[in-house]
């Protein structure tokens, strides 16, 4: 699964922005990348919606400022206006497999769904 067309490139660029500590610390910047109907199943098993993710990142302060190492980023355009990305992350010794769906909207590409699954130890 790998496609590097313009839609996938844009989704990858935006995904990496969401993982940037400076972006994560800003509710406005995070909110600009999340679809109004965004939801996530986190590595903790918790279900998050757009409002709860923005609030959690804003309240995390320095905890959210640590570096997130990304590897194995791959993507494919499933249909016009819909991109699926898969990749792995490591942060503070925690590793997770990740999957994201990006949707093209009138305001640009927005993250619609995300799931993180911890690595088996």
PLM feature segments, named:
Residues 1-32, 37-121:
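A beta-strand edge to alpha-helix "cap/lid" segment located at domain peripheries
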